[in-house]
Amino acid sequence: MNKYYDLVKAPIITELTNKLIERQNKYTFKVAKTANKVEIKKALESIFQVKVLSVNTRNVLPQFKRKGKFEGYTSGYKKAICKVAPGQKIEILANE
């Protein structure tokens, strides 16, 4: 069980992801870089008790950032977009 919580790190909440939730019932999560689609699907079904129809993954590359004289990179991560069965939903925020 703890393995599943190590794979799924956090939900990604933006205006675009909220539109995906409303229109297509797709949820976006930040996941471990070593996770594959099958592991992500099993983890989400176990944690949230929903039927996941599909999982799309994408590696987000680090971006160069500069603040005054300081330069650096943001950290890269892997993101998963998961489609949930119709009629089911994942309660990400308590206010929804």
From Swiss-Prot:
Entry keyword set: Ribonucleoprotein, Ribosomal protein, RNA-binding, rRNA-binding
Domain of life of the organism encoding this protein: Bacteria
Matches recorded under Gene3D superfamilies: 3.30.70.330
InterPro entries reported in the protein's UniProt record: Nucleotide-bd_a/b_plait_sf, Ribosomal_uL23-like, Ribosomal_uL23/eL15/eS24_sf
GO CC terms, sorted: ribonucleoprotein complex; ribosome
GO molecular function: rRNA binding; structural constituent of ribosome
Keyword RNA-binding carried by entry: yes
GO biological process terms held by the UniProt record: translation
HAMAP family, alphabetized: Ribosomal_uL23_B
Family, as annotated: Belongs to the universal ribosomal protein uL23 family.
Subunit record text: Part of the 50S ribosomal subunit. Contacts protein L29, and trigger factor when it is bound to the ribosome.
Described function: One of the early assembly proteins it binds 23S rRNA. One of the proteins that surrounds the polypeptide exit tunnel on the outside of the ribosome. Forms the main docking site for trigger factor binding to the ribosome.
PANTHER family per record: 60S RIBOSOMAL PROTEIN L23A (PTHR11620)
Protein name stated in the entry: Large ribosomal subunit protein uL23
Species this protein is from: Onion yellows phytoplasma (strain OY-M)
